[in-house]
Amino acid sequence: VKLETAIPPLLHQALQNLHIDALYSHQAKAIQKIREGKNVVMATPTASGKTLTYTLPVIESILETLESKALYIFPLKALEQDQLKALKEFTLPIKGQVKFPAAIYDGDTSSYRRRKIRESVPAILITNPDMLHLSLLPFHTQWEALFRNLRYVIIDELHTYKGIFGSHLAQVIRRMERICDFYGSRPQFVACSATIANPRSFAERLTGLPFEAIEESGAPRAGRNFLFLNPTGSPYTLAAKLFLDCLDNGFRTLAFTQARKITELLHTWILQDRPDLRGRVSSYRAGFLPEERREIEAKLVSGELLGVISTSALELGIDIGGLDVCILVGYPGTITATWQRGGRVGRTDRESLVALIAQPDALDQYFMRHPQDFFGRGFESAVVDPDNSVVVSRHLICASAEIPLRMEEEIIPLKNYGALLDQLVAEGELLRSASGKEWFSRRINPHRMVDIRSAGEGFTIFEEGTKRLIGKSNVPRVYNEGHPGAIYLHKADPYLVTQLDQGKKEVWVKQADVDYYTRALSEKETEILSVVRTQHLAQFTSCYGRLKVTERVRGFEKRRIFGQDLLSVHELEMPAHVFETMGLWIILPEGVSQRVKEEGLHFMGGIHAVEHASIALFPLFALCDRNDVGGICYPVHPQLEKPAIFIYDGYPGGVGLAEYGYGMLEELLKKTLSLIQDCPCLDGCPSCVHSPKCGSGNKPLDKRAAKFILEWLLGEKGPEKRGAEKIRKEPFPSSAAVLLPVDSEISDPRGDMAATRRPAWLKEEISRHRVLFLDIETQRSAEEVGGWQNKHLMRLAVAVIYDSLKGSFDVFKEDGVHDLIAKLKTAELIVGFNIADFDYNVLRGYSSFGFSTLKTFDILQQITSKLGYRLSLNHLAHKTLNMEKSANGLQSLQWFKEGKIGEVIAYCQKDVEITRDLFLFGLANGYLLFETKAGQRVRLPVEWDLSKIIKA
């Protein structure tokens, strides 16, 4: 389309040189609004030509007035380089006629170059928020030519300024506007964003200015194909194989991982498998030197590199040339980030492929089970709180050092911050003038004390001996990863923390060759300071308000890297991290706790699981990750005197996430219920209710109780309904076993036990042999004895045996353990579930007898050898027998400690019954039933023949 106002001849010449004869409709619309003096935010897809929409007006203004200046702000240095390159290419054909000086001013700019730039400020200055905060605003008198003539401020990748970074940038922008006002300029803002749900309101909250939004793109797009993969094995192994397959088929490929370590590991594995690709494949992540990053980017553009494995560092709009395939190793966390990363390939007229390889994580598995929701779901909203009191107070100090604060100011509304001003004066950070009308900073350069990318106090990490800088951390993260005894990972290398110096804000580490990692154990308390809003939803009440959160690291675990076995637990004395923030809380209705207990479920485990799962799904609605929000639950909160679940912003002062979550809480709980219902596990797993950051080691958790509680809260009937399941009739492929579909006639075995699962011939056959079905319960947990390798120290609480020859049960306590062992020696066959690895190892604490000599049939071993992975006894019982365990091991331990031996015996006997009936079902039918990750209920063929098993 054509612009309403003609383009100057020189610009027309520059466009023709780039073979641009016309503009897309969204470009023309945006340029027209910019020409009208309006602030504009563009939220159109990747590669839709957003850069051109601000390049034309900026250069047009320079042609009109040579003193005109523009400030370009990018979140990453690589984007700055990209922009400078694009500007040079655009202005090349008219370079001889008009000068368009542009320069980058960032941390990589030499001291000499910085001085030259300040002495002669270019028409276009390209920088980042950190440099604006630390180097431009504090020394604005040296940048008068920039701020007095500033016509445009360009903010690229607007959507990245969410959370605490966004709260800081909001204040940095207001400080910049204040300085511009001081010099008599009022710059116009142009922002570019990935597609988000709320570009206009987000831009307005970030800048405090009105905006016009351009959201509909007129640019053509090539076809994009999506492939969802949910591996039963390692997602990383599959990613490496797919990456190589793509390269071998001539497709240039980009793989995104979730962590630096995985990026480097994938790169290593690929080159180990294919050394011929060295120099044609590279990793890319933060932490690389600037010249290393630029070399990789240049090789991607030139085609020298066939593939790259990257963290999110390549997610943003760096020009990386034409690629064909994007492999997402794990769901990126948001729809916006997924499309942003997928948009890095197929950026010309070629079709592209985006392959999402799921990890055992709640969000990943949610979309694997609900792909229609992925494609039908709108983009998330970007959330920012410009009024975070902790952030505002720090920037008030910075602003007062730049230009004294005055109460009548409008850009920074001091009338709203009276309490903060009084507090800062009382703390000695601000000095009030004699007239009482102005405030000054006590410090000359307070900006150095403010890290705009974090909220807590900063700590520096050094290596012992060399005193080499290893990295940085902040409160509260430093208490979790920088405590004495912690293993700190840097570039995949392990370091042992030897000292945490609170006074100097230093952490000292030394290199360590260890086969374990550490995980902090913590405890939390939440105090309600004020209630801002209250609402009644479905069958519960929720509130939003100000909270005081107290977090304390009380110890840490050592876990083996391979297998994650618990090795040991260590206590710590660490200072509490206390902060005020904003949060929401759900007040559970009267009676729900009692009903959960009546169902034989664990109430605390249920609300704990609801808390974990709802936080895991929070990114479905807002741009964030699960580390941006925290949670805690109470069976009885001391202030409310009722059960409650809290979800709060994980940063002091709040960042707006809890407030946003409060507005969509019912929808969040519905999605949480769907996640828990659809996950095939029975007792909870990382795909539903486990949290990688749980300070109590994911204990207690009760998935069934969580489902019951959510159904109650949402107004559905409480107890789980049982009905015929709809089962797909096509087979589920597996390289480990042939999984046959279930016939509808026998898909849900019910009714008479003898008729359905124990035919007469089987009952008669097994009664002729002494087959003992064994299960034991212990007195101590693995944690209490220093890890699973110490099963022999767990001590016997109760053992139950079903004797097929007698047709009855025998119960043994610790004082009868030798009678138990003697009984086992009489058996023709002993059947159990995980008996070889667990039960026998517990009994080895009492006897040197060689239990491996006993004729044993371990059902779990049989299943693992077929599938390549484990299934729980409860899962098999539920899917095969329509039965469920009566409790769990944690509950049994608690009963024993409370002296409730009768409950322990009943629980143990129930497990023996389930084990027996699973074995008999397999003997009679030749299969067991289980449910796949995709929700398919299928057969697992078993070739069990009693006589052959006994004779083997």
Task: Give a label for each model feature.
Residues 1-18, 22-25, 29, 35-48, ...:
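Helicase motor core with emphasis on the C-terminal RecA-like subdomain
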Residues 351-354, 360-377, 395-406, 417, ...:
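Extended Lys/Arg-rich polyanion-binding regions
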Residues 679, 684-688:
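Short cysteine clusters
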Residues 711-762, 952:
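Acidic, low-complexity intrinsically disordered tails
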Residues 736-752, 756, 916-952:
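Acidic two-metal-ion nuclease catalytic site recognized across multiple nuclease folds
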Residues 748, 752-829:
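Conserved RNase H-like, two-metal-ion catalytic cores of nucleic-acid enzymes
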Residues 801-875:
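Conserved DEDDh/DEDDy metal-dependent 3′-5′ exonuclease domain
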Residues 881-940:
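Acidic, Mg2+-coordinating catalytic module of metal-dependent nucleases/exonucleases
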